[in-house]
Amino acid sequence: ELPGQKSRQEADAIRLRQALLPQLTVPKNQNMPLQQTGIRLSRALPYILHCSAKVELARQQVQLIFSNTGEQVAVFHVYNKLDLEAIPRRYMVEAGKQLDDIWSVHDGGYDLWVLGPNGFHRSFQGNLHSKLYSESLPEIRICVEECEPKIYLKLRSDGQKTAKLVIQANAYLNKSWHIETRTAETELLLDMSEWYGWYDFTVSLENEPEFKRRFAGRIETGKDSYSDPFIGYSV
């Protein structure tokens, strides 16, 4: 018999006594709790994750490629925002491994939302029926160095024509860049040292509002850092 164990009668008696106690009054005006602002020390994490998209125009498909160059297994969650009734796909990627999967488009369109640990976020949107998009097929991937909080943004065109891309910082950096892609990769360096490796930016295609790529998260360098400076703020 466990210490402190009560019989049913004893438990019922306790419940009845508690029911006779003064009840809490629910406030008429209620507010949602607010996240405390400011940064906190944050341990280094063993995740170095990558996710990029590749469009297969002839098959009307989108391929997502997941890679884990960190030291621990990681899980990616993918939501199809054009079919939210579908069960999200989940991928467990071992350290040093890579895998991929295919999504069919809906009337040419796709909108895939990828989530991972510690704020890792990728969003891939587009419409393959768009002439401007299908002729240029721009794609973007992120490369990082494991020792510095810097991003090497690599942009290219997989189509027959060049693409004019706009890179817009959503937080941290108050900047935007305009880059014309070619078949050979164009590289843009973003130094996020001032923000402890945290980043959030969107890449869009000029004159094509349906194409977007969003990248957010924290660059892991193997060193202890700080929590997200924008927690508690509206972005």
What are these language model-derived features?
Residues 1-235:
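Membrane-interface soluble catalytic domains
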